[in-house]
């Protein structure tokens, strides 16, 4: 599952969402890969434009090593 144009530090990147049960997402740009994982913070649920009605949990904050 992929959704695009995610704003991360003002830079548009391609977002690759992992399995829902991991509550992690990976951000990939040309020069770096960042991975964000959920913990006790509130997560937001995003609809993926190319898959209407399907939702996946994507989280902000608590950056972990790729």
UniProtKB/Swiss-Prot annotation:
Annotated Gene Ontology cellular component terms: extracellular region
Swiss-Prot/TrEMBL keywords: Amphibian defense peptide, Disulfide bond, Secreted
Record's subcellular location: Secreted
Disulphide connectivity of cysteines: 3-24, 17-37, 43-58, 59-64
Domain of life: Eukaryota
Tissue distribution of the protein: Expressed by the skin dorsal glands.
Protein name as catalogued: Xenoxin-3
GO biological process, one term: defense response
Protein function: Lacks alpha-neurotoxic activity, has apparently no antibacterial activity, nor anti-coagulant potency.
Keyword Disulfide bond tagged: yes
Family annotation (InterPro entries): Snake_toxin-like_sf (IPR045860)
């Amino acid at each position: 599952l992929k959704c695009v144009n995610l704003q991360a530090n003002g830079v548009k990147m391609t977002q690759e969402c992992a399995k829902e049960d991991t509550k992690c997402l990976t951000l990939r740009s040309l020069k770096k890969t960042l991975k964000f994982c959920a913990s006790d913070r509130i997560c937001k649920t995003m609809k993926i434009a190319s898959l209407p009605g399907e939702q996946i949990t994507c989280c902000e904050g608590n950056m972990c090593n790729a």
